Amino acid sequence: MSELLNRRLSLLGANLPLLKQCLHGIERECLRVTDEGRLAQTPHPEALGSALTNEQITTDYSESLLEFITPALADPAKVLESLEETHRFVYSKLGDEYLWSPSMPCTLPAEEDIPIAEYGSSNIGKLKHVYRKGLALRYGRTMQCIAGIHYNFSLPEALWPLLREAEGSTENDRDYQSSAYIALIRNFRRYSWLLMYLFGASPALDKGFLRGRPHQLEELDAETLFLPYATSLRMSDLGYQSNAQAGLTPCYNNLASYTDSLRKAVGTPYPPYVEIGTHVDGEWVQLNTNILQIENEYYSNIRPKRVTYTGERPIQALTSRGVQYVEVRCLDINPFLPVGIDLTEARFLDAFLLFCALEDSPQLDNGECGQCTSNFLTVVKEGRRPGLELHRNGQPISLKDWASELIGRIRQLANLLDQAQGSDEHAKALDAQQAKVDDTSLTPSAQVLARMTEHDESFVQFSLRQSRVHAETFREQPLSNEKQQAFETLARESLARQSELEQNEVGDFDLFVGAYQASILAISS
């Protein structure tokens, strides 16, 4: 254990109540499917409100890809309760459709028949739609149908000044906090392979997903492709490469270098996109011809975040007010869990992220950056391979040894969290993960393959069965009238807000896009 972590643990031990002020939020994406396990071609249900203005129920890429968003709360149990209630409400409005249980998609229609999400006729609604048309053009619609869990986490705001003072930092509070979150992200890059081993749940996929493209996967049956030791094919390259983003590798050495690299990417034309242009036959097909249309197009496993004001762009918020929380984006949906994640996973994530934040986090040089990427990709493709070795400081080390050692180091944070909350829940969550390290058959990825083999099911058959099991769970536990009414009010109010936006819209869409592009160039370095 580093001396820095020791000192920080002592400081936390003397300020235990602070640890009850960490905030958590979850975003869960999931496809709407028919009772045959095919993509639902119906519009976003009006009974769920406006996908543009409902803050709890929206759509991601496709009209058929729902996204549920919880509030940020201090108690992860309450966050999961909120997510569960959203699922129960949605099921009361879904008719004979289902929410798809895993991350990898159901049987998809032809590429051009995957519906892109619609957000109405306001300028901001049209901007969101054109952005998604650009994603289709650049990466294909099929790729955009993969779903995941995003876990948002922040440390208590009151902790940063204490740490800054104890360490005699010359940075102001805001910059110290941003530097600390970027340090968390560097450690996350070092250790996130562990999350893929423990929580990866996508070792197989529907054959049609690859659209006949060449791949290195094996056949499990006539309809299913897999890799025998894979943990998360969702997070592997799957033969897709974004050449445009290939040169975009911010190694998170400070906030300024991160925002600068993103600002350059949203302002630098990419020749193949320039060749297509922003319009085809007079219709918008992408917002611009730059490497990234907007910041959120940058694909990463974790993002530094700051809540934005209306009309503000993510880079503007980060540059002016610093980092407020991190968004973990590499978590698979666990198809065995009704909402795709449970409290045990959340408790482990809290201890893991706290460890990443407080452990010493030197700058990443190119060699270590490459090693982090390589370890991550090795684990997603063959994390359960017996005797698998990763690389640490350029030296080989067995995954099992390193995982056990890491869990041992994270345990100190789990113990502090338990002391703060007067429980042993975090320690138990760590025990459950250590058991998976000791026995690979306990990992979700192994369990998925075991169930499919046991029931002689294809990926789609297994997934549909799980989706039906969860649907029954939710439908058997309807919300109280009061809760149901609250969701229905949210939905109605969101539709009214969208309608108001559309009625009060002034200004031409082309000018709106121009102003939106210009806003990024106005940010000074």
From Swiss-Prot:
Q: Which GO terms describe its biological process?
A: glutathione biosynthetic process
- The EC designation for this entry is 6.3.2.2
| Superkingdom of origin organism | Bacteria
Record's GO cellular component, any one? cytosol
Q: Which reaction does it catalyse?
A: L-cysteine + L-glutamate + ATP = gamma-L-glutamyl-L-cysteine + ADP + phosphate + H(+)
Question: Which pathway does this chain act in?
Answer: Sulfur metabolism; glutathione biosynthesis; glutathione from L-cysteine and L-glutamate: step 1/2
Its keywords, alphabetically, are: ATP-binding, Glutathione biosynthesis, Ligase, Nucleotide-binding
Pfam families membership: Glu_cys_ligase
Detail the disulphide connectivity of this chain as listed in its UniProt entry. none
Q: Which GO terms describe its molecular function?
A: ATP binding; glutamate-cysteine ligase activity; metal ion binding
Q: What class of enzyme is it?
A: ligase
Read off the InterPro entries from this record. Gln_synth/guanido_kin_cat_dom, Glu_cys_ligase, Glut_cys_ligase
Family, as annotated:
Belongs to the glutamate--cysteine ligase type 1 family. Type 1 subfamily.
Alphabetized HAMAP family for the sequence? Glu_cys_ligase
Question: Any idea what this protein is called?
Answer: Glutamate--cysteine ligase
* Species: Pseudomonas putida (strain ATCC 47054 / DSM 6125 / CFBP 8728 / NCIMB 11950 / KT2440)
In the UniProt record, the gene name given for this protein reads: gshA
